[in-house]
Amino acid sequence: MNRNQNLREFLPQDGFAGTLIGRAWIPTAVSGKTAGPSPVWLTESGVLELSSIAPTCAELLDNGFSTKGVDASKLANVGSYDAIMANTLASKRDANLPYFLSPVDLQAIKACGVTFVVSMIERVIEERAAGDAKKADEIRDKIKTRIGADISSIQPGSLQAEELKNALKAEGLWSQYLEVGIGPYAEVFTKAPVLSSVGPGAEVGILAISSWNNPEPETVLLVDSRAKVVGATLGNDVNLRDIEGRSALLLGKAKDNNASCAIGPFI
């Protein structure tokens, strides 16, 4: 950890004013029980263990957790936010102290692709460049000149989108990425297996064979089993542009790798 790093920068601008749910590893030395992960509630006075209410974040959110009616004095305080975050970010964590984990545990982890005009065009560029970063600038200029202005005002799935699709096909510029960008169906894929996401302080995984990649900041929505959005956090989708650019069928190889899904710090 950078000694000058402000630990409070990992909190929302309003600090602890809202309801902040996280997940932490609680060692036996602190809990007096078998060491393990637990949902936690972050407050100004301390980080409160919620395992007595629900054993996982998935169950906690699915049950519609609310701080109203919860007697905080009956919950175990496992330490201050600052102390736990400092241990989370430490180059060598103290195993006898708690540290934060990804707040996502048993939920399925899905991702949506080609959600913005810019990202859609970039996917087309990757496909045309076949994973070659040197060709990307030339192709980017060509595509933006030809279709950039038209795409931005198109309503996906509309008659106008269908007309544009036909025009692009005629010009040899049609792409599977434009299909999901302006077509009626969104791209939704499984990003990572259950319990595989990493949280604050962890290093993300980059496939060793990739030489053209970048972080991909995302808004992460927490959705219960009734399809209701119950919370939000941040994520890094970790994009291997040279791998996916070779073929969309390599999406799994580009996206689903060890520690390639970073989520957090808190819901």
Regions found by a protein language model. Give the residues of each.
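Short, solvent-exposed loop/turn segments that connect beta-strands within catalytic domains
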Residues: 29-36, 228
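Active-site microenvironments in enzyme catalytic cores
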Residues: 2-26, 42, 69-267
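N-terminal cap/recognition module
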Residues: 35-78
